[in-house]
Curated annotation (Swiss-Prot):
GO CC terms, sorted: nucleus
Species per Swiss-Prot/TrEMBL record: Arabidopsis thaliana (Mouse-ear cress)
Disruption phenotype: Lethal.
Protein name: Nuclear poly(A) polymerase 1
Listed Low complexity bias regions: 507-526
Amino acid sequence: MASVQQNGQRFGVSEPISMGGPTEFDVIKTRELEKHLQDVGLYESKEEAVRREEVLGILDQIVKTWIKTISRAKGLNDQLLHEANAKIFTFGSYRLGVHGPGADIDTLCVGPRHATREGDFFGELQRMLSEMPEVTELHPVPDAHVPLMGFKLNGVSIDLLYAQLPLWVIPEDLDLSQDSILQNADEQTVRSLNGCRVTDQILRLVPNIQNFRTTLRCMRFWAKRRGVYSNVSGFLGGINWALLVARICQLYPNALPNILVSRFFRVFYQWNWPNAIFLCSPDEGSLGLQVWDPRINPKDRLHIMPIITPAYPCMNSSYNVSESTLRIMKGEFQRGNEICEAMESNKADWDTLFEPFAFFEAYKNYLQIDISAANVDDLRKWKGWVESRLRQLTLKIERHFKMLHCHPHPHDFQDTSRPLHCSYFMGLQRKQGVPAAEGEQFDIRRTVEEFKHTVNAYTLWIPGMEISVGHIKRRSLPNFVFPGGVRPSHTSKGTWDSNRRSEHRNSSTSSAPAATTTTTEMSSESKAGSNSPVDGKKRKWGDSETLTDQPRNSKHIAVSVPVENCEGGSPNPSVGSICSSPMKDYCTNGKSEPISKDPPENVVAFSKDPPESLPIEKIATPQAHETEELEESFDFGNQVIEQISHKVAVLSATATIPPFEATSNGSPFPYEAVEELEVLPTRQPDAAHRPSVQQRKPIIKLSFTSLGKTNGK
């Protein structure tokens, strides 16, 4: 492998952690990894690769014909008509070289000043494409944050963006990496160009492109298997994973992919968020475009997992991440680190790392969001809108109830027996380490109604677009969420996660004080009434009720919520810094209290194991300490839909490794104390918004049951 030190070049904003080269063991493990990635079908065939190149050539000729047509229609002189040109660029996974079979190709059409987006791109070009027999499934999205047209050309999926440059002629050798190309460009053009500029810059900033590609393929596959690959759901998308992998490649420039994967988990499991990830020092530029800078922009201080793009204007590519999704990803990084350490002693293999996360076994309680529409086209539009808003439900629950965590599933589910309908699910559980009280109530009616009001404010809403939100127990999950539509007869056994859960249960049940508390809670609960679970028996009444638009008689609904550790502990100042951020770091200290009607009783405190730390070498010089407080309200548009008033604390720029919670079971979802959340009888709202039918709202009541009752259905 070529060393980056052969020419004295340094990559990134800090010195590498290690310049060590590969060992024979690394070569073997990397070959095993590459074979595994091939066996699971992550590489396209040579025939498909050739077909993609042919399709891109056809698309380039289409846009060149289009630009000649509109130039002639607008009466340009003969010279400009002769030189009229448009050009196709690629970006995303295809440009990075990590796309798989059947993946979309992200493309950008760059056109001259006289070819407008509204009238020409979404006008004449859209008309031309619609009349071509080789073009199918044409879906223009002119109102998107980054306007695009999606379609298939000869069976290959294309996402086509448009950038209108203030040039009369687009040269065939146009270089998009020059900042001057952004001068006098409109905002939508800047955003459209950003994909290509960022992708190309990533490839320039990694020491070895082939090692980067193999590692990124691995991490993308791992993230999808573990359910943390989705920008819209609050996790990380393709560009985010690419930036994180590129940073690891910079820190270990001579390492093979097996080491890069291992160090990925080791570094980011210990990373002290919200310290930002940079591939290069941010360029403030000379064009006056806004860049990510928490020293200047107060709202940038609210980003909890900033991963900054390397091309001007630098932006936070991960502003969608929430407290809950960050907690989930940190748990997954910890799990990955443990498995990679086990692999070094041959106690685990790549199959172990890529075990899919059993989402529908991880929780006892879920929120089910059902949507439907009148026809396929309406459902496609409605689905896209609802997916973009689901993150708001997670944020609202986090904001209103600081002790509850939401885990959104990144994909939708289709019930084949119900056409024009799909469902989304969120796991619910309570933070560990938060004092809890029997009988404590959480009125989530307002939260659900706020979310539904936001969704129903869709500007393209038409009758037939419906949404309902309800609670469902694990034992009542519909069969269509399981592979093949068949509910498994038992939970997963023999996996890394299940073994960790078993170990954790054994350690939990050995605690005498906890057992005493449990007995008291169970005896008090058994007096509550015939609807209470006794000895693990199911309630006689239904425990999965959907909050639809149809008025129904009130029912009690039980929701079990495991308690888990708070992630908000202060970092350990004695541990070596691994921060490489060239900026100071910020986070919010805003607080939100639960809506409670009854005073808390029998507060149970759960102790945590003493923290451990796993230090690694410093990779940057700590910066000066700075403290600042702000009190402002910000409107975040698409990032946070409602105004928030926060008291923001500016953290020390010296990054330290956060405490390691030894209570983890190898999964971000510890199985400890189990709570029962019961929905109390509710009244119908006085007024209903669109849709016109009124909807019930749930009140959730918490009461504790057995600590050892963690696998009950």
